[in-house]
């Protein structure tokens, strides 16, 4: 989730807005094949994005920390991870700086950017790239459909294309 901390309107002249945000999330992964649905892994991320907007153009610069941790139930079922001192083989920890540039003239948005990872454990190639398009037709209504396609490429995987297609309903400006 992203929360705005402070916004400057017309900071560099009329229509130039700058905002500092904080973002955080936790993603739990459960073993649904077990009767107790044990927590296998939990991923955390904490970031400090700065967003600049002028008319239809926006830019997000962000420092982000990401980490993944094994769940207690998983380690209890696999004690060899702890006894063989292999815990660091399963931990993922990195920081990144990313920049994403966006153009949103009306009911569609196109974006693209890059990320550079640093302080990475385990060590890996540092560069990533993202781009995509989002469509929100009929966005003048409080409830409307949205769809998009997101592409993610990583140097670590020889720039193989990873893509995600999204469809949903957006609710905004609800009249109460």
Label for each model-derived stretch:
Residues 120-176:
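Outer membrane beta-barrel transmembrane domains
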């Amino acid at each position: 989730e992203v929360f705005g901390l402070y916004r400057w309107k017309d900071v560099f002249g009329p229509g130039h807005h700058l905002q500092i945000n904080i973002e955080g999330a936790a993603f739990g992964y459960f073993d649904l094949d077990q009767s107790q649905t044990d927590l296998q892994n939990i991923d955390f991320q904490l970031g400090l994005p700065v967003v600049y907007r002028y008319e239809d153009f926006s830019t997000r610069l962000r420092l982000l920390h990401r980490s993944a941790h094994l769940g207690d139930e998983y380690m209890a079922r696999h004690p060899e991870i702890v006894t063989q001192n292999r815990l660091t083989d399963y931990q993922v920890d990195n920081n990144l700086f990313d920049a994403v540039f966006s153009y949103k003239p009306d009911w569609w948005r196109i974006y693209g950017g890059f990320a550079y990872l640093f302080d990475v454990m385990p060590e890996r190639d540092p560069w990533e790239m993202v781009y995509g398009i989002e469509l929100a037709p009929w966005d003048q209504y409080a409830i409307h459909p949205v769809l998009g396609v997101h592409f993610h490429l990583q140097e670590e995987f020889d720039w193989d294309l990873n893509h995600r297609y999204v469809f949903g309903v957006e609710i905004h400006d609800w009249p109460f």
